[in-house]
Amino acid sequence: MQLKKITLCLLAAGLHLIAFSQIEHVEPLNWWTGMKNPALQLLINGKDVGSTTAVINYPSMSIKKCTKGQSNNYLFIDLIIAKNTKPGTFNINFKKEGNTVYTYQYSLLAREKDAALLKGFNPADAIYLLVPDRFANGDYSNDVVHEMREKKIDRNFDGARHGGDIRGIIDHLDYIAGMGYTAIWPTPMLENDMELYSYHGYSITNHYKVDPRFGSLDDYKELAVKAKQKGIKLIFDEVLNHTGSNYWWMNDLPFNNWLNKPDSFIRSNHRRTVNQDKYASAYDKDMMTNGWFDKTMPDMNATNPFLAKYLIQCTIWWIETLQLGGIRQDTYGYSDKTFLTNWSCSIMKEYPSFTMVGEEWSLNPLITSYWQKGKQNQDGYKSCLTTIMDFPLQSALVDALKEKEGADFSKGLAGLYEALANDFVYADPKNMLVFGDNHDMDRLFTQLNKDVDLTKMALAYLLTIRGIPQLFYGTEILMDNTGHHKNDGLIRSDFPGGWKEDSVNAFTGKGVSNDQMEVQTYLKKLLNWRKNNPVIATGSILHFAPFDGIYVYFRYNKEKTIMVVMNKNPVPVKIDVKRFAEILKGKKKAENIITGDPVSIQDNIAVPSKTTAVFSVE
């Protein structure tokens, strides 16, 4: 086929020749043939590139339009990639007054087989959340990168970088898989070229670059491949709402409205209810959506169509590049909600079996449920977001285990029972993300006042109730931040054994306490049991109102019945099973899934003190 020359972007020519030397950025870095959406928009950044004419030569490709940014250093090229376009490399020639001033080679890759069928995490999975800088240091050579603004490692300061990296995660995939996890969620590993607190990853300064202190893009790809080989899905932690204040474009924005409130720092009021509140003032809505999350985190204006396209394509690029098993979206609800619909629906159109979870930190299920796909909202708002983090249930679980049992029908285990009863407000409760803690709140062991038994009770609940369980690294060894409430750096402490100089190694068991070993062993047993019992992922729930510090619920399908008994009492109890006849009728035996002991369920069931007992009913 003869190549057809296509010349576009005949922009207003200047009166003098450009002093044009190079293209600084072309994003996305590459693209693929065979995508469902044939459109691709390239962001081109380089000195005076807006005054050039872009010329390409490639078969089966057309250009819809080109748009110059308000800064003359940006050009946006909209391409249409036909279904029959072949993978390959083509030149983008940038011309001025008939002369080519720069040529950039761009690549169209062939998609991985069945990439469009990528499956996201689901209720059959158990997710291990980890902070890469604090998990394991597998490559000491990248601890300090002199080109970066934060140049030191200091494990004695909880706000500094400690040296964990992608190699450290790869090195311990066997541990993660052996524990029974089937998905990992590392906090962001993209470039965070900030002077301070760059370890956490949420001040991104380049959406298309892995932070070199974590490793390279090849390392990230290796992690994805090796995790998949071990049955572990990789979840990408993304931030659409804001960037870091040292982002490469900050001193020369493509458009004047690329950021919200760009001229002075105004903090978000964090009033997330304005998205649903029919009485909310325009002032409060503006402060919520357009205020900055923090003074080093500029708020991106996703109502700008070029930025919106940029962010959507960025998500797709990472899904396709790493063959991801899911996206976790930070600060969901802070961005423009029309954009959030466009973003979520664009991703799901390209990957219909994918999963994305949004962080909506509200304890009100009426607020959290608003964002989930399938929800019939009064204001007509529609979303394609599959999964929501279940903050209401997290809070109810901790309160239930800490509060005294009594006559108040909304306290203690009764509060947990009623929290689950709120599931009628969710479009798809089985796809809620359930958790006891995460990297932004006090550790579960701390929240439960360092009570080992209550911690085990919480873990058993999370692994047997509806939803997709997410556990935080170190929970298995009772890591805590007691005495340092909401100290983020301490909450995200180093995992013992992740550094070669560590005297304690929780990966091998060297030096761990008896309590730590007990919980680690207990959790490993539960996780691996759950992985092999699909009734927990897909089965129905039947629960009975708590009484006398005891809460009983069942997970069941046609093939199997699981009985869960939460006994919060400080003494063992015997439970009369007659109350549960509607589900236990005709069943006589069960097995304690932790101890393996047989149990008769014809009369009474004995349950130890402060225990969540799980029985497989025969």
Can you name each region flagged by the protein language model?
Residues 21-51, 108-113:
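Beta-strand/beta-sandwich contexts
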Residues 1-28:
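Bacterial Sec-dependent N-terminal signal peptides
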Residues 58-65:
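Short, solvent-exposed loop/linker segments at beta-strand-coil boundaries, enriched for Pro/Gly
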Residues 70-118:
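Extended acidic/polar, glycine-enriched regions
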Residues 125, 135-316, 321, 340-350, ...:
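Substrate-binding/active-site clefts of carbohydrate-active enzymes
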Residues 130, 176, 186, 207, ...:
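Conserved, mostly hydrophobic/aromatic
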